[in-house]
Amino acid sequence: MGVIINESKSVKWEGKVEIADNFIKRAFGFMLRNPGHALIFILPFETRFNATIHGFFMLKSIDVIFLDSEKTVVDVTTLRPWRIYVPKKAAKYVIEGPVGLRKVLKVEVGDKVEWIT
């Protein structure tokens, strides 16, 4: 179990939190898996290109939160299967989770987000 915290609004989401900190975990993400937990991608560089995500082979839509190196939200979206999304600004961290994650966290651009695994 883990927790994702919107420190700007003092709200949290509790559930399984997995860190995708290597190429294989980042490459597969939620492909062919049910997004019932949160997956946090730690990217090697803070760029828009590295933070681009896709929904290829995904079974369901997911909520996605993009954070810069200071863990400040720079973009938020809901990604549908078979779509590609490029964040509006460079990101160092990407949080993927079930649809509703962004609503529970009340997350908006500019919020500070932290997690505990």
UniProtKB/Swiss-Prot annotation:
InterPro entries: DUF192 (IPR003795), Saro_0823-like_sf (IPR038695), UPF0127 (IPR022906). It comes from the Archaea. Belongs to the UPF0127 family. This is UPF0127 protein PYRAB11210. It comes from Pyrococcus abyssi (strain GE5 / Orsay).
